[in-house]
Amino acid sequence: MAGIGVKLNNIYGKNTLTTDVIGMGYSTVMTIAPMLTVIGALCIMEYFLDFSSVGYVTRELFSCTVLYIFIFALLTASPFNSVLSKYMSDVIYEETYADIMACYYVGLFLNILLSSLVGIPFCIHEYLVGKVDIIYVFTGYCGFIALVFVFYSMLYLSICKDYKKISFFFIIGMTVTVLLSFWFVRGLHKSITYSMLLALTIGFWLIAALEFSVVRSYFRENSGNYRAVFGYFKEYWPLVTTNFLYTLGLYIHNFVFWTTDLRMIVVRSFVCVQPYDMATCLAMFTNISASVIFISRVEMHFHERYKAYSEAVIGGRGCDIEITKKRMFRMLAEELMSLARVQFIITLVIFLFCMIFLPRLGFGGMTMRIYPCLTAGYFILFLMYAEIIFLYYFNDLKGSVMTALSFCLSTMIGSIISTHFSEIWYGIGLVVGCFVGWSVAYARIRNMEKNLDIHIFCNGHLLKRTKGTCPSPKVFDRYQGDTEERMKES
């Protein structure tokens, strides 16, 4: 995010309302440009291919297929990405770049394996129980795997800071998708929904191929050191847990409402609650720019203070360590407050825009009644995510797991309770869950501030840990001379 960070800091550095709005637009577009491209392609296909003329069940089958492809592609990728990012950061620091492709192939294998374990049983159920045509089912599965591939390769392009290429590849892929869908319907006279699904699948595979080609162009050598990657999963399992619980928490409130009487079941396989799911999508888009704003500002500001503190720990005086520590935590507090201030302006502007114009575009009723509460929830959620990033900086993996677990469980319990409330309070479960997670993370950061010296200087071990019999505590015998263990060491 360094390139984006420089641009954003030039914008926000003027500290005016106008520049905040400009920064809002820039960060939002850079963050969700790929998603906007996909949504735009779907809207174009639905409008020009007369999607509304298709039967209701067929339309809902297509909509639910696309919804499930996106949600579960994110969920199945979440356990691996954080550990792989950690491994690649260490590899880049050590300048052993040949290990990156080994990491890429291991991560890709794990992603595809988990996605297949989730997707294949569902597809079998969809075919046998839902009586959906097997070609349609297989095409949907291919689209799911392709999107998993796309999301996974985006991780490596982000490390290479090729954010513009990611957006460019999505534009190419979705342009091909739209053109192919027209050809399938007008030229080959295929059904509208299957043509759209097939074209979307081909578009995803094209994006995945383009991303893979760029990754291969950057990292041509493969060390074959696959075992080291698996070792990281064993050592940094808290990262796996944190990322999975955080991603699950993003959608667990949807899953709770999918069990209520509001749910709609399509072909005895897909479950959804359209008004709530749409409100969730709008609320997430309203606040998603917070992530890129925060990460870019951390790289440009807090990271420098963190680096100065680390250098003081390595070779500075006691007073230098104390001064740099205070400056670092002062910057941490400033960044959290700045994020809250800027994101509040962004959220408020987008929220007012949605409340005024979306009803004119057909969004209304229950969706717009649920939307405000969910917007507040996602506002707190991205502030909580910022705190998790800070916990990563201080290697507080236990705190990050506690934060993600409390967030996920509180959101689930709160959502179960909120199903008995009126529509306007349906999103209160997410608000409560995010606030609980934010509070846990804040408490861990304050505890880290008070006990940072203990965390830094008292977590090492004077003796190397090994497995085996415990050596004799006797290091010297005045009557026998050196002990047997000392003689072996010498």
What is each stretch, according to the model?
Residues 67-72, 109-113, 121-156, 345-350, ...:
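Alpha-helical transmembrane segments of multi-pass membrane proteins
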Residues 20-32, 36, 167, 225-252, ...:
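Hydrophobic faces of transmembrane alpha-helices in multi-pass small-molecule transporters and flippases
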Residues 169-216, 424-447:
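Hydrophobic alpha-helical transmembrane segments
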Residues 199-203, 207-299:
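Transmembrane helical elements of multi-pass membrane transporters/channels
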Residues 157-183, 391-413:
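Alpha-helical transmembrane segments of multi-pass membrane transporters/permeases
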Residues 1-42, 60-64, 230-239, 456-490:
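N-terminal membrane topogenesis motif
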Residues 60-89, 247, 251, 280-305:
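Small-residue-rich midsections of specific transmembrane alpha-helices
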Residues 94-104, 277-357:
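Specific pore-lining/lateral-gate transmembrane helices of multi-pass inner-membrane transport
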